[in-house]
Structures are given as structure tokens and as C-alpha cells.
Amino acid sequence: AGTENVPAIAGLAAALAQADANLPANTARCLDLRQRLTERLLAIPGTHLNGDAAQRLPGNVNITFDGVEAETLLLLLDEAGICASAGSACSAGAVEPSHVLLALGLTPAQAKSTLRLTLDAANTAEEIDTAAAVITACVQRLRDGVR
């Protein structure tokens, strides 16, 4: 089906080799950043980490803020330049609470108060601290009844 794109194939092989070589360092960095973010968010009263604290993807934080509608929180975060989601990537925009969160034992109200944050090794500690501060302020604002 034609001539193979040898330069692209070679480039892909080089990129995969580099990604594989960087995987241990990138994973360690993500774990450190995830821990930093998780600690800061769990300092907010009425906040709960969903799932096992250790057995999760290195760049995944799934957290519930009691009494805060995630969709409203997402609007405030978007205005502040913070990217987050109220559910899995494949269910973004769904009205029903996440069946996965319900299976983990969350109530429908808790599932609708849950935020998913992802990060990678390119994120900085400063970005994590900024995101945590913005999320903290937005959660407090919503709990105080200010929209």
C-alpha cells in the first residue's frame, strides 16, 4: 500500500525510546507532585480523596468537596485558568453521577461534588501550589454561598 514513511517510523522509534528511558524519572516526579497537591487539597475541611491513596495513576487526583457542586466549581476554576473535570474523560458533561464513584461507595451527592485533576511531569511545584490555592479559595467561596 505504497512506500513506507521511513523517517516517520524512525522518528517514532526514537521518541518511544526516549519516553521509555524517561519513564522512571517522570513517574517519580508525578508522584511527588500528586502528593503535594493531595496534601494541600485534603487540608480543606470536608474534603475526601477517592480511591486508594497509593494504588492509582501517578498523575491522578480524584477528590470530593462536601457541599460543593462540581459543575459550579469547574466554572470558577475555568475562569481562574485551572483545568479540571467533574468525571472521567469518557463521561465529561454527563448529568448522572459517575457509576465508578458510586461503586466506590460515594453517595450521588458526593459523586456530584467530585473533581478529577490530572498532572504530568511537565507541571511545576509552583503550578501545583497555585492550583491548590485557587481551588481552596473557590471551594470556600461556594461554601460561603458566593457564586
For each feature predicted by the language model, list its residue ranges.
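Glycine- and other small-residue-rich loops at beta-strand/loop junctions that grip anionic moieties
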Residues: A1, N26, N62, A89, ...
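PLP-dependent aminotransferase class I/II
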Residues: A1-A19, N26-L33
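Glycine-rich beta-alpha junction loops
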Residues: N5, L16, L37, F65-G67, ...
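Structural signal for hydrophobic packing residues in well-ordered secondary-structure cores
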Residues: L16-L23, L41, P45, G81, ...
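Conserved PLP-dependent catalytic core of the aminotransferase class-I/II
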Residues: D20-L73, E79
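Conserved C-terminal alpha-helix-loop-beta "cap" of PLP-dependent enzymes
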Residues: G59-R116
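PLP-dependent enzyme catalytic core of the Aspartate aminotransferase-like
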Residues: A92, E96-R147
